[in-house]
Amino acid sequence: MTKLDAKSIINYIGNAPKKTPVKVFIKGQLDQIDFPEEIENFNETHSGVIFGDWKDVEPFLKENQDKIQDYRIENNARNSAVPMIDMKKFDARIEPGAIIRDQVAIGKNAVIMMGAIINIGAEIGDDTMIDMGVVLGGRAIVGKHCHIGAGSVLAGVIEPASATPVKIDDNVVMGANAVVIEGVHVGEGAVIAAGAVVTHDVEPHTMVAGVPAKVIKKVDDQTESKTGLEDNLRKI
């Protein structure tokens, strides 16, 4: 994936065709209906499913109402500019319920848990675990072999375009429900305690805690023994 800066993301969203995707379960005299190219159809004689943009599907349903006995519509977005990413292309473990938008980079053997939300432009390094309910905002960067604890938030910055994104270096461990404010750089091997709100850069191999987060100590053998990561969880 080509890395996108803020201006590129803004242009991508601004110029993208806005779509309202729908799936319609339909029954009727379907063999008597001509389906336009812009509507995908998987139909038999009297029942089937169609997929398309609502701007195309709505008039189609009205034009063929005399041949359609009944239908049910499923819809999960309105005028959406950014589709969900094709997860099949990643050599990573992505659990059900993760929400990942297009233009996201995910490294080899990364783990994305249930309920994680990853916005456009975010980057996740090899062997990094994004735990349940984590929010990675636009352009947030997480390095290799990290653990971002459940419920944590890495603030996103798409606007203003001049803003600096959150950057988490390699081998960082972040406890549950921690928050890292936009523009903050967390150095390699740092530890962020659960519930911390990080408003300033964190030096490498440093442990911070509190609201706002303050330095507690340098990471030592005792800290590493309590925050060590399990590579078996990252096997595909």
Curated annotation (Swiss-Prot):
GO terms for molecular function: tetrahydrodipicolinate N-acetyltransferase activity. Its EC number is 2.3.1.89. Keywords: Acyltransferase, Amino-acid biosynthesis, Diaminopimelate biosynthesis, Lysine biosynthesis, Repeat, Transferase. It catalyses: (S)-2,3,4,5-tetrahydrodipicolinate + acetyl-CoA + H2O = L-2-acetamido-6-oxoheptanedioate + CoA. One of its GO terms (biological process) is lysine biosynthetic process via diaminopimelate. It comes from the Bacteria. It is an enzyme of class 2 (transferase). Pathway: Amino-acid biosynthesis; L-lysine biosynthesis via DAP pathway; LL-2,6-diaminopimelate from (S)-tetrahydrodipicolinate (acetylase route): step 1/3. PANTHER family: 2,3,4,5-TETRAHYDROPYRIDINE-2,6-DICARBOXYLATE N-ACETYLTRANSFERASE, ACETYLTRANSFERASE. Catalyzes the transfer of an acetyl group from acetyl-CoA to tetrahydrodipicolinate. Belongs to the transferase hexapeptide repeat family. DapH subfamily. This is 2,3,4,5-tetrahydropyridine-2,6-dicarboxylate N-acetyltransferase. It comes from Lactobacillus helveticus (strain DPC 4571). The lineage of its organism: Bacteria, Bacillati, Bacillota, Bacilli, Lactobacillales.
